[in-house]
């Protein structure tokens, strides 16, 4: 076999071992080279049998980088100091609201009074937590407090002295003269009066049909039945 290079002066013992070939072992012919079947398809890349270990280590490094808010710097005199990575906003004063039996009090520097100061409610003090996460119990208390405030305001407002049923009856100002039934609009009353008078002013537009209806929507619905039969 023709070799492009001369291996006569090559020290075989100094050559690195290849997979399946132990540094040629002084063999000069290709026919004497034998590769084991087990190592025939092996690659030079390492096998990651513990891939989850590598993945966990990578996650740890990423989390450490993401939540590390300081970095180390050197000053002019050679001393090392830690400085924040991100811009830190000033610590704003949180506003706490306390509900008692008398009034609603706001703990803030502002001297303005809210319109809700006249409302009353029985509840505990609601403050914003330090971590910004509101628990389910605190959320339910806030929701119940808002609902009770709204209900109490509706009850104390003189304009909302009527109940829902009384309010609906008040809005039904169009009364039928025959059956004394009330309606909220004059159109509904006129449509209802056709039941007593028997008026059927809407004729079916289909040729040959003599059906008449008191309501326009019923007439159109009947007309569509003719169109479906003709298809």
UniProtKB/Swiss-Prot annotation:
Its main location: nucleus. InterPro entries: Znf_C2H2_sf (IPR036236), Znf_C2H2_type (IPR013087). PROSITE patterns: ZINC_FINGER_C2H2_1, ZINC_FINGER_C2H2_2. It is found in: Nucleus. A zinc finger (C2H2-type) spans 174-196, 202-226. The keyword Flavoprotein does not apply. GO terms for cellular component: chromatin; nucleus; transcription regulator complex. The modification Phosphoserine is found at residue 163. One of its GO terms (biological process) is negative regulation of pseudohyphal growth. Keywords: DNA-binding, Metal-binding, Nucleus, Phosphoprotein, Repeat, Repressor, Transcription, Transcription regulation, Zinc, Zinc-finger. It comes from the Eukaryota. GO terms for molecular function: DNA-binding transcription factor activity, RNA polymerase II-specific; DNA-binding transcription repressor activity, RNA polymerase II-specific; RNA polymerase II cis-regulatory region sequence-specific DNA binding; RNA polymerase II-specific DNA-binding transcription factor binding; zinc ion binding. Present with 556 molecules/cell in log phase SD medium. PANTHER family: TRANSCRIPTIONAL REPRESSOR PROTEIN YY, YY2 TRANSCRIPTION FACTOR. Transcriptional repressor involved in regulation of glucose repression. Binds to UAS-1 in the STA1 promoter. This is Transcriptional regulator NRG1. The gene is NRG1.
């Amino acid at each position: 076999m023709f070799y492009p290079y001369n291996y006569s002066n090559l020290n075989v013992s100094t050559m690195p071992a290849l997979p399946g070939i132990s540094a040629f072992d002084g063999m000069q012919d290709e026919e004497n080279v034998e590769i084991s079947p087990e190592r025939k398809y092996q690659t030079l890349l390492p096998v990651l049998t513990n891939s989850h270990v590598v993945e966990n280590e990578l996650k740890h490094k990423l989390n450490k980088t993401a939540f590390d808010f300081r970095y180390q710097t050197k000053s002019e005199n050679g001393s090392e100091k830690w400085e924040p990575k991100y811009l830190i906003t000033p610590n704003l004063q949180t506003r706490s609201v306390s509900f008692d039996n008398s009034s609603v009090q706001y703990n803030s520097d502002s001297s303005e009074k809210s319109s809700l100061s006249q409302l009353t409610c029985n509840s505990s003090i609601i403050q914003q937590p330090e971590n910004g996460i509101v628990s389910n119990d605190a959320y339910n208390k806030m929701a119940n407090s808002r609902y009770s405030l709204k209900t109490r305001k509706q009850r104390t407002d003189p304009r909302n002295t009527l109940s829902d049923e009384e309010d609906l009856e008040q809005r039904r100002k169009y009364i039928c003269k025959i059956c004394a039934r009330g309606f909220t609009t004059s159109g509904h009353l006129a449509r209802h009066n056709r039941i007593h008078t028997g008026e059927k002013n809407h004729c079916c537009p289909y040729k040959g049909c003599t059906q008449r209806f008191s309501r326009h929507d019923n007439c159109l619905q009947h007309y569509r039945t003719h169109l479906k039969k003709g298809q």
